[in-house]
Each structure stands twice: as structure tokens, then as C-alpha cells.
Amino acid sequence: MISRDFKISNKLGLHARPSAQITQVASRYFAEVWISKSERRVNAKSIMGVMMLAAGQGSVLTVEADGPDEAQAVDAIGELIASGFGELD
């Protein structure tokens, strides 16, 4: 299992479009992928779960993965979060 923390930098946080982007990326991998904020942990392949995190700008998310391509899954989601989901000014 691999785990890394990422900070949400876009102004609107995890609204519908970024949540959909995360689930699309997570679904490309065989690994089980979870995202946590505080005490809430959700399946990263579930758009409803990701949206329920209600992660605003400045929130820190922990991305965890377990499986044959776990490192690639965490890296890909981390790159997406770092890019601000294409919403950075």
C-alpha cells in the first residue's frame, strides 16, 4: 500500500467536474484507490463518495492505493490535484 497527501489548490475545490476527473483517473487502474479527508475515507472510483468529501481550497487529501499499479494510481491522481483540475488562474 502507498499513501500520499495532496493539497487542493483550485478555488472551487472538489465540485462535480474535478470529482468526475478523479474517478475517471482512478478507474484506469487495477489498484483499489481511496481518498481521505479528516476522518472520512471514500472509494476514489465513486463520484458520489469523492463529492461527499466536500474538500474546499486548501484542504489536504490523503490518496491511498493498494494493488499492482498502486504507485501509478497515486501519482496520476496527485498530478491531477496539483494541476488544479485545469482551474488555476
Give names to the regions the model predicted.
Residues 7-57:
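Compact, glycine-rich, soluble single-domain proteins
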Residues 56-89:
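C-terminal structural segments of small proteins and small subunits
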Residues 1-5, 60-62:
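Intrinsic-disorder/low-complexity, polar/charged segments enriched in Ser/Thr/Lys/Arg/Asp/Glu/Gln
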